[in-house]
Amino acid sequence: MMSENKLHVIDLHKRYGGHEVLKGVSLQARAGDVISIIGSSGSGKSTFLRCINFLEKPSEGAIIVNGQNINLVRDKDGQLKVADKNQLRLLRTRLTMVFQHFNLWSHMTVLENVMEAPIQVLGLSKHDARERALKYLAKVGIDERAQGKYPVHLSGGQQQRVSIARALAMEPDVLLFDEPTSALDPELVGEVLRIMQQLAEEGKTMVVVTHEMGFARHVSSHVIFLHQGKIEEEGDPEQVFGNPQSPRLQQFLKGSLK
C-alpha cells in the first residue's frame, strides 16, 4: 500500500518585484519521508520552506496538506495568501517549523514555551498542555532542572532542542526544519542532529533545509538540490551524493564535502 501523502507542493514561485527567487519548485512528502533540501546560500531553500507555511507569501503555486487543498487568493500586492484565516491557523498546526535562531519566547520559561501553542492554538487545558510539554521535553533530553529556566540561560543546543519539543508538542503532520544547526557552535551540532535522526527513525515526516551533508546523505529518504530557485537535481541520497549528474551539483558537493 502506498504511504499517505502528507504534503504536496506544486510549482511554487516567489517573486520580489522583478526578481524571481523561486522558479517553480515542487515537492511531495509521504508519511515517514525525510526530505533534505541542499544548495548554496541564496538558492531559495529557506524561502521555499517559509512559503510552505505562509511565513512568506508565494507568488504562484498550490499546496495540499494531508489531501486538503489550501484555498489561496491574491492579496493587494498580487501575492498568494490563505483565503480563510481558520485554514491558515490549521495549516500551521499541521506543518510546524523549527527555526535557525530558535525563536523561543524570552519572557517564558522552557516549559511555558512548549505549553503555549497547545493551549492557545489547540485549546488544550493547562494540565494537558503541561503533560504534553513534559513528554516532549523529556524526548529531546531537557531535564526538569532546565524546564524552569528562561531561554537565555540555556546553551544554543539546548535552545534548539526546546524549539524541536515545541514543534513536536503540536503533534503535526510534517516538521519543517530551517537550517536548524547553522546558528550553533560546532560542538553543539551533534546533539541536535541526534534528536533529528531519532525522529526520522520513529517515522516522523520531515522537510529539512540543511548544510549538514552527513545528515542529508545518511538520514534522508530523498534529497533535493536547489540552484538559483529551481530543482537542479533530486533523488535518493545514494544517487544524489554517490552519482551526481548535474555539473552544478558535482561542484557543490566537491566544495561541501572537503
Curated annotation (Swiss-Prot):
- Which residues of this UniProt protein bind ATP? S41, G42, G44, K45, S46, T47
Is Translocase set as a keyword in this record? yes
What broad class describes the main subcellular location of this protein?
Answer: membrane
An example of a Pfam family matching this protein is ABC_tran
Q: Which reactions fall under this protein's catalytic activity? A: a polar amino acid(out) + ATP + H2O = a polar amino acid(in) + ADP + phosphate + H(+); L-histidine(out) + ATP + H2O = L-histidine(in) + ADP + phosphate + H(+); L-lysine(out) + ATP + H2O = L-lysine(in) + ADP + phosphate + H(+); L-arginine(out) + ATP + H2O = L-arginine(in) + ADP + phosphate + H(+)
Q: What does this protein do?
A: Part of the ABC transporter complex HisPMQJ involved in histidine transport. Is also part of the ABC transporter complex HisPMQ-ArgT involved in lysine/arginine/ornithine transport. Shows ATPase activity. Responsible for energy coupling to the transport system.
Q: What is the protein's quaternary organization?
A: The HisPMQJ complex is composed of two ATP-binding proteins (HisP), two transmembrane proteins (HisM and HisQ) and a solute-binding protein (HisJ). The HisPMQ-ArgT complex is composed of two ATP-binding proteins (HisP), two transmembrane proteins (HisM and HisQ) and a solute-binding protein (ArgT).
Family from the record: Belongs to the ABC transporter superfamily.
What is this protein's record name?
Histidine/lysine/arginine/ornithine transport ATP-binding protein HisP
Organism of derivation:
Salmonella typhimurium (strain LT2 / SGSC1412 / ATCC 700720)
